[in-house]
A protein has these predicted regions:
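Membrane-interface interhelical linkers
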Residues: 1-14, 28-31, 37, 45-74, ...
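Residue-level signature of transmembrane alpha-helical cores of multipass secondary-active transporters
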Residues: 11-13, 74-75, 102, 137, ...
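Structural motif at transmembrane-helix junctions in multi-pass transporters
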Residues: 35, 88-104
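Hydrophobic/aromatic residues within transmembrane alpha-helices
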Residues: 39, 92, 119-121
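Hydrophobic core positions of alpha-helical segments in small-molecule transporters
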Residues: 42, 104-105, 132-135
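C-terminal transmembrane-helix exit sites in multi-pass transporters
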Residues: 111-129
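Hydrophobic transmembrane alpha-helices of multi-pass small-molecule transport proteins
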Residues: 129-149
C-alpha cells in the first residue's frame, strides 16, 4: 500500500478514533449496569446487531454450516479476543487512562502484527521484518514511557 493512499489511511484513523470512543462509553454503561461485564455484553450485543444488518444488506448469502465447522480452529479466536478486548478496555481504560491504555494496545497489536506478517500466520501474505518496522515498535514503547512519565515524577502538565 502506498503511503499516500489517503482514503485508506483516514478510514483506519477514524476507526481507531471510534475504538477510542467506544471504551469510555462501554465503561460508562458498565458502571450504570453494575458490572463492566454487563457493559461488554451490551456493547457486543449492539455490535452483533449492526454486523448482522451489514451482512444481510451487503452479502445476502449465508455460509453453510459445513463451511463454518470445517474452518481452522483458530478462527474462533477472533471472537474470543474481541470479547476480551471489549471487557478489558472497560476495566483497564478508566484505571490506566485512555491514552496509556490504547498506546499499550497499539504496542500489542503492532508487536504481534510484525510476527504475523513475518511468518504468514493465519494465511496472511508474508512481509519481511525490517529495521524500520522494529524501530516503529520501539517508538511505540517510547510513546508509552512519555505518556506515563508523570508516574516517574516528571510531570509537565498543561493544566
Amino acid at each position: 500500500m502506498s503511503l499516500f493512499n489517503w482514503p485508506l489511511l483516514v478510514t483506519a484513523i477514524l476507526l481507531g478514533m471510534g475504538l477510542g470512543i467506544q471504551a469510555p462509553i462501554n465503561a460508562w454503561i458498565g458502571k450504570r449496569l453494575g458490572s463492566p461485564y454487563w457493559g461488554a455484553g451490551f456493547s457486543i450485543s449492539i455490535s452483533l446487531v449492526v454486523i448482522l444488518l451489514f451482512v444481510f444488506i451487503m452479502v445476502r448469502t449465508i455460509p453453510s454450516a459445513e463451511t463454518i465447522w470445517n474452518a481452522p480452529w483458530w478462527v474462533w479466536l477472533g471472537g474470543i479476543f474481541g470479547a476480551m478486548f471489549v471487557a478489558g478496555a472497560i476495566v483497564l481504560g478508566p484505571r490506566m487512562g485512555m491514552a496509556l491504555f490504547f498506546t499499550c494496545v497499539v504496542f500489542g497489536q503492532v508487536s504481534i502484527s510484525l510476527l504475523i506478517d513475518r511468518f504468514g500466520w493465519f494465511e496472511i501474505q508474508i512481509r519481511e521484518l525490517s529495521v524500520s518496522r522494529i524501530l516503529g515498535v520501539l517508538l511505540v514503547i517510547a510513546v508509552i514511557l512519555l505518556i506515563q512519565k508523570e508516574e516517574f515524577g516528571l510531570s509537565n502538565s498543561l493544566e
